[in-house]
């Protein structure tokens, strides 16, 4: 009815009749991958379009699969798309040292990616971890990864900035810088 190519949402837990205020991770298990894939397949049938699931940050390790393996299981079983948040891959690596960005990306089928997200993150000394705040400039490592992925796949990159949003002129300067870094040959 809306004519959209796909609908996107975070690959995170939710509940009936309850509101969760943060993106809680789904346990990274084969059982949960099948359960989630079944729900995504059903939703795609009802909506009449593909769903693109976005990888989330997680602040505790859950399950026996690596996040990329879980994501790929869900994608394969449901035939859904991926909205790949490059910043979240970096944040999860910094916090857990479980799966390097290179190892993560080796498990992702880039042909299923609809587009990429980049954002800023910050270290929170109180919690002693990095937090996906979307409140600062994107770090160079994240930009470099997104650039490589975009060049390989031909997919677009979206900048997210949700908190502590600066003046429009500052955002435009950041976008111009990001664009020049992404489009440069080096």
Enumerate the predicted regions with their spans.
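Active-site acidic/histidine proton-transfer and metal-coordination neighborhood
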Residues: 1-82
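Conserved, mostly hydrophobic/aromatic
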Residues: 7, 51, 85, 116, ...
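Active-site beta-loop-alpha junctions enriched in small/polar residues
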Residues: 11-12, 56-58, 87-91, 118-123, ...
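Gly/Pro-rich active-site loop or hairpin
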Residues: 23-33, 92-154
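Alpha-helical packing segments of well-folded alpha/beta enzyme cores
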Residues: 36-39, 43, 145, 149, ...
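Catalytic cores of glycan-processing enzymes that make or break glycosidic bonds
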Residues: 37, 41, 161, 186
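Distinct, well-ordered alpha-helical segments
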Residues: 61-77, 92-106, 169-172
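C-terminal helical cap(s) of enzyme catalytic domains, especially alpha/beta-barrels
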Residues: 167-186
